[in-house]
A protein has these predicted regions:
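A short, structured active-site edge motif that brings together acidic residues
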Residues: 74-89, 132-133, 191
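Beta/alpha (TIM)-barrel catalytic core signal, keyed to glycine-rich beta->alpha loops juxtaposed to Asp/Glu
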Residues: 112, 119, 123, 127-131, ...
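Short amphipathic alpha-helices and their capping/turn segments at secondary-structure boundaries
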Residues: 58-72, 110-123, 202
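Non-membrane alpha-helical structural segments and their capping/turn regions in soluble enzymes
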Residues: 32, 54, 101-108, 142, ...
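Eukaryotic N-terminal low-complexity, Ser/Thr- and Lys/Arg-rich leader segments
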Residues: 1-17, 30, 69-70, 93-94, ...
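N-terminal binding-site loop/beta-alpha segment at the start of enzyme catalytic domains
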Residues: 1-78, 88
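Glycine/small-residue-rich loop that forms an oxyanion/phosphate-binding "nest" at active or ligand-binding sites
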Residues: 90-120, 132, 142
Length: 303
C-alpha cells in the first residue's frame, strides 16, 4: 500500500512561521555555534547531510542536544533532515561508509552514522528519529536509485519519518513516485534560471503534496534580485531585497534554504518575512499585484 509522510507541505507566505530551513553546509568548525544561533533566532527547520566534505553532521547534533538541554527548543519543535550522499559526492578520504561496499551496505552504514550523530541525548546511541532522509542526488542509474529508495523505505516510519530527494529532475521524481511504496515527501533543488525555476517539477510537487525546498535562492538569482516585483516589494514593505525575494519565493509554495552565517541576518530575515506578512495582510490588493507579477517572471522566465 502506497503511503505518504506527515511532513507538512504548507509554505505560503501567510503561514505563521516563515518558511525557512537553516542550511548547514560549508560551516566547518563553526557549525555548532551557527546552528545554536539559528535556533535562538527562531529557525525551527534544520538541513544537514552525511557528507563530511561539506557538512559537519556531528556538530549539528551537538548543537541540537545543547539546545534541548538548555531549553531553547524541544525535539518536537524541530524539523530535522539529513541526506545519504553517494561516493561521487564524497571526499573518499573522509566519508561515513566504505565506498567499495555494496550499495545497501553503504546506505545502512550512512544512515546508522546519521542516527548516531543526530541522537537526541548523549546517553543514547541513536536518534529517536530523523524527520526526513533525502537522497542527496539520484544514483548513476534509475535502477540503483529505486534500489536505494526501497531500502530507505524500511526505516519509515520509526527511525525515519519521511523520505526525499535532492538535485532531481521531473522524470526521475516521477519514476520514484510511481515505483515506491513510501512516496517522496521532500524535493530540494536549485532554484535558478538554468532549470526554468522547476516550474513543471514544482507543479508536480504541489499536485502530490511534496514539499519543494529551494537552494541558491539568492546566489543563483542576481537578476531576480534586481527585478521590478522585488524592487516594488522592497519599497512597499520597507524590507531589504533579499527578504523581498525570499518572501515572493515562499509565496510560490516553497520552503527556502537559508545558510547565513550572520546572527544579525538570521534575525533580520525572520523578522523581515513577518514584516512582509503583516504588510500583505494590510494591503491584500497590492500584495496580489506584486505576487502575480513575480509569478509571471518565474513562470515564463522573463528576466
Amino acid at each position: 500500500m502506497a503511503t505518504t509522510s506527515t511532513v507538512s507541505t504548507s509554505s505560503r507566505l501567510q503561514d505563521a512561521q516563515p518558511a525557512f530551513i537553516y542550511g548547514t553546509a560549508w560551516k566547518k568548525d563553526h557549525t555548532k555555534r551557527l546552528v545554536k544561533e539559528a535556533l535562538v533566532a527562531g529557525f525551527r527547520r534544520i538541513d544537514t547531510a552525511a557528507q563530511p566534505r561539506h557538512y559537519q553532521e556531528h556538530l549539528v547534533g551537538e548543537a541540537l542536544r545543547e539546545a534541548y538541554s538548555e531549553g531553547i527548543v524541544t525535539r518536537e519543535d524541530i524539523y530535522l533532515q539529513t541526506k545519504y550522499t553517494t561516493p561521487a559526492g564524497q571526499d573518499l578520504s573522509n566519508m561515513p561508509y566504505d565506498p567499495s561496499a555494496p550499495l545497501d551496505n553503504q546506505i545502512t552504514t550512512s544512515v546508522s552514522s546519521s542516527l548516531k550523530n543526530l541522537r537526541q541525548q548523549d546517553s543514547v546511541e541513536v536518534a529517536t528519529y530523523i524527520d526526513c532522509l533525502l537522497l542527496h542526488s539520484p544514483l548513476p542509474t534509475i535502477e540503483q536509485t529505486l534500489q536505494a529508495w526501497k531500502l530507505l523505505e524500511s526505516y519509515v516510519p520509526n527511525q525515519i519519518r519521511a523520505l526525499g530527494i535532492s538535485n532531481v529532475t521531473l522524470p526521475i521524481l516521477q519514476a520514484i513516485y510511481e515505483s515506491s511504496s513510501i512516496k517522496p515527501s521532500v524535493v530540494q533543488n536549485r532554484f535558478y534560471p538554468q532549470t526554468r525555476y522547476d516550474v513543471s517539477l514544482r507543479a508536480f510537487c504541489a499536485e502530490h503534496g511534496i514539499m519543494y525546498q529551494s537552494f541558491w535562492t539568492l546566489t543563483g538569482n542576481p537578476a531576480l534580485l534586481k527585478s521590478k516585483p522585488v524592487a516594488d516589494l522592497t519599497l512597499a514593505a520597507d524590507v531589504g531585497r533579499p527578504v523581498a525575494l525570499y518572501a515572493l519565493v515562499m509565496d510560490l509554495g516553497t520552503v527556502v534554504l537559508n545558510g547565513t552565517t550572520s546572527s544579525g541576518h538570521m534575525h533580520d530575515d525572520l523578522s523581515g518575512i513577518l514584516k512582509v506578512q503583516e504588510w500583505a495582510t494590510m494591503k491584500p490588493r497590492e500584495w496580489a499585484t506584486v505576487s502575480a507579477s513575480f509569478r509571471g517572471l518565474i513562470d515564463h522566465s522573463q528576466i
